[in-house]
A protein has these predicted regions:
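Extracytoplasmic/secreted cell-surface and envelope-processing proteins
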Residues: 87-90, 117-121, 203-206, 231-235, ...
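A domain-start/cap signature at the N-terminus of enzymes
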Residues: 1-77, 103, 142, 146, ...
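Alpha/beta-hydrolase
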Residues: 79-81, 197, 286
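Primarily recognizes the serine-hydrolase "nucleophile elbow" in alpha/beta-hydrolase
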Residues: 158-160, 165-218
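Catalytic active-site module of serine/aspartate enzymes centered on a nucleophile-bearing elbow/loop
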Residues: 296-308
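Histidine-bearing beta->alpha loop at or near hydrolase active sites
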Residues: 267-270, 287-292
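The feature captures the conserved acid-bearing segment of alpha/beta-hydrolase catalytic domains
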Residues: 192-278
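Serine-hydrolase catalytic machinery in alpha/beta-hydrolase-like enzymes
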Residues: 40, 46-48, 52-62, 73-165, ...
Length: 308
């Protein structure tokens, strides 16, 4: 049977001014939040609660199982990591991952960050002492609660579904990209690919003082989407073009990429494909786009990157 995409109509709420209207949950309401279009709440999105990490603290996560899932077939697993002050279900409605899953038959997991709707990653909160080295920071943050939750969810999904362990992917938006990037740098050996929108990492977390890279996991296929008008956090002490440049250089170094990419322009998506001896890197500059992710980005991630 030909794979299909299901486009559900929704009821627009054009008066909405909330970042994540709670009324969306379980309804057909759709909104446009700062240029980010939502989809109707997916009918098959499962909400789960439980203690799955050894510290005894409860977590919440959402699982999407498309009707096209075939239990006898090895199936990819996609982690969708929400932005700051968002939720797992919020990431599901502000992206098109569930629609891609309908077409392709893979499983989606959308976890909630454990605390305050913010992932436990360096660069989110400045709680490390100033004199602490990048090495000690990296070691301390290597196995946070959120990281342990991801590992626990992988094991849970492997028990419940016929998951292809060689096709586990992670994608994040903004703070979720911080989480995705940190996980890729520390535990990327279990990922087939990592992708993110906005949210480039601060350079002190990528490079030692001598310029060598900070990396525990080795190479991993990476996709970086950078909106042209992304902007910087309040009181940021760094340059946007510089941080984007060196976030790209970081993975070019780790993946041993060729310096000259193949270029393709699709509408407002300016795409650079870097071939790597160890893993590829895709860099996308999105013209006229501010901080956020386009609704079709999940399709780009899958069609150009994760599907291979």
């Amino acid at each position: 049977m030909e794979p299909k995409i299901f486009l559900r109509s929704g009821t627009p709420n054009d008066d909405n001014r909330e970042y994540l209207p709670e009324a969306i949950k379980g309804s057909d309401m759709v909104v446009n939040e700062n240029g980010n279009n939502s989809i109707p709440y997916p009918a098959g999105l499962e909400e789960h609660h439980g203690v799955i990490v050894d510290d005894g603290e409860p977590d919440t996560w959402y699982v999407y199982v498309p009707q096209s899932y075939r239990p006898k077939k090895k199936t990819p697993l996609i982690f969708g990591m929400h932005g700051g002050l968002m939720t797992g279900w919020g990431h599901a409605v502000y992206t098109s991952w569930t629609m891609v899953a309908d077409r392709e038959g893979f499983i989606c997991v959308f976890p909630n960050a454990h605390r305050d709707r913010m992932w436990q990653v360096d660069g989110i909160r400045d709680y490390e002492p100033a004199e602490e080295s990048s090495d000690s920071r990296d070691a301390q943050r290597c196995m946070t609660h959120d990281t342990k939750m991801v590992f626990a969810l992988i094991e849970q999904m492997k028990v419940r579904f016929n998951i292809d362990e060689e096709r586990i992917f992670m994608q994040g938006m903004s703070a979720g990209n911080f989480m995705t990037g940190q996980f890729a740098r520390q535990h990327g050996q279990i990922l087939a690919g990592a992708a993110g929108s906005g949210g480039p990492c601060r350079l002190k977390l990528l490079f030692h003082d001598d310029g060598t890279v900070i990396n525990r996991a080795g190479p991993v296929a990476v996709w970086q989407s950078r909106p042209e008008k992304n902007g910087l956090p309040p009181k940021a002490d760094y340059n946007e073009s510089l941080i984007n440049k060196y976030n790209r250089f970081y993975w070019m170094k780790v993946n041993e990429c060729d310096p000259i990419p193949e270029i393709r322009i699709l509408g407002e998506d300016n795409m650079a494909f870097y071939r790597g001896k160890r893993a590829p890197l895709t860099y996308v500059d999105i013209k006229n786009r501010d901080h956020g992710q386009a609704l079709d980005e999940a399709f780009l991630y899958w069609d150009y990157f994760f599907s291979g």
